[in-house]
């Protein structure tokens, strides 16, 4: 953590002075928290270490449920705990083939998890949006769909539009201004 403190302690100070925030994506990028290939910020244990080492509120997370599901972490419980540190959200989901996991385990070489476009995965996005709103999040959910094994290439835009409409329904539909405000 000394190198993290050295680098991100300085960057946090600059961000504070400029009025901006720094968000780490919760993706392992092929590594683990203690042997990262690219990204230290993929697990709650790492987040605790990072935010304790540099306690600035300008440091937070770019969060998406996909990376939690593929690690068998409950994204809803995690979001409830960390919502105050969520500064950006990716709309990316995952599907877990629990029948394959139960029969073959996770080291059989048989694929058991897929990154999915919102609306085609296992995440309850109504809960995600509710928790984000209750936690004061006012940002966007940026749909990340090219990973989807079905809605990619020539079907990517179809998946993106479906996800946009799905997420709008999950938030309660089209925005309607309160006439009493």
Language-model features: locations:
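Active-site-proximal loop/turn and secondary-structure-junction residues that shape catalytic pockets
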Residues: 26-30, 65-67, 95, 147
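Hydrophobic faces of well-ordered beta-strands that scaffold small-molecule active sites
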Residues: 22-24, 59-63, 87-91, 139-144
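Gly/Pro-rich active-site loop or hairpin
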Residues: 33-48, 67-138, 152-158
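Active-site acidic/histidine proton-transfer and metal-coordination neighborhood
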Residues: 1-60, 70, 178
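C-terminal helical cap(s) of enzyme catalytic domains, especially alpha/beta-barrels
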Residues: 153-176
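Aromatic/acidic polysaccharide-binding cleft in carbohydrate-active enzymes
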Residues: 144-147, 151
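Alpha-helical scaffolding segments of alpha/beta enzyme cores, especially the outer helices
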Residues: 2-13, 17, 45-49, 77, ...
């Amino acid at each position: 953590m000394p190198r993290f403190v050295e680098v991100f302690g300085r960057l946090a100070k600059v961000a504070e002075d400029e009025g901006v925030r720094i968000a780490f994506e919760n993706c392992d990028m092929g590594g683990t928290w203690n042997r990262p290939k690219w990204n230290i910020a993929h697990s709650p244990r790492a987040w605790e270490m990072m935010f304790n080492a540099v306690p600035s509120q300008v440091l937070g997370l770019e969060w998406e449920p996909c990376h939690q599901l593929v690690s068998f972490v409950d994204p809803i419980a995690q979001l409830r705990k960390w919502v105050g540190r969520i500064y950006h959200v990716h709309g990316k989901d995952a599907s877990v083939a629990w029948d394959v996991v139960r029969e073959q385990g996770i080291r059989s070489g048989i694929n058991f998890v897929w990154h999915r476009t919102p609306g085609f995965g296992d995440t309850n996005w109504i809960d995600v949006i509710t928790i984000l709103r209750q936690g004061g999040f006012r940002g966007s959910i940026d749909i990340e769909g090219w990973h989807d094994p079905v809605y990619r290439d020539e079907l990517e835009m179809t998946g993106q539009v479906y996800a946009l409409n799905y997420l709008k329904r999950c938030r309660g539909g089209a925005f309607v201004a309160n006439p009493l405000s």
